[in-house]
Amino acid sequence: MSAAIELRDVEKSFGEVAIIRNISLSVAQGERHALIGPNGAGKSTTFNLISGYMAPTSGVVLLRGQRISGLPPYQINRRGLSRSFQVTNVFANMSVWENLRCAVLWSTGQRYAFWKNIDNLPEVRERTAQILADINLTARRDVTAGLLTYAEQRALEIGITVAGGADVILLDEPTAGMSHAETERAVALIR
C-alpha cells in the first residue's frame, strides 16, 4: 500500500539560495504528523511544495503513489488533498455560511449556476450546517467573514479545509491565535 503523502529527495531553491534541501518523508493514510521548527525553517514552503503552490526544484511529491509535483493546486485538491494557510485565507466579503457552502459544493462536484438555488440542495445544506456546528460558529452564520475575530477566522478556515472532503489535509498553524477552548474544539474536529 502506498503512502498518503510521500516526498522523495525534494529540494527548493530560489536562485542560488537553497531553501529546502533533500527532504524525504512518507506519511501513511490515517497518520498525523507535525512539522516543527523555528520561523523561516521551511515548514510553509514544504506545504506549498506538497500542495502545488510551488514546484520543487528537484525531487518528487506523491499523493497515494501518484506524482503530483508540478500540478496546479486545484488539480491536487481534486485528487484529495486540502490545506489551510499560515495567513488566514477566507472570502472576507462572504458570510461564514457562504464560505463553508463553497467548500461543500466543491467537494460534492456541484457547480454554481445563477438560475439554480443552491440552498435547495439538501446534501449541501446539511453538510454545511454540520460543519458550522462543528467549528462552533452557528451563531455567527450570517456574519461577513472579514468581521470575525482572528480566532473565528482560523476556525472557519479549518472548517473550509475539512469541508472540502479531502482525505489528506495539511494545516499550517491551525490554532494560532485561538484560546485553549477554541484549540480543543479545533483539534477535536481535525481528529
Model regions: which residues?
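Glycine-rich phosphate-binding loops of nucleotide-dependent enzymes
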Residues: 2-191
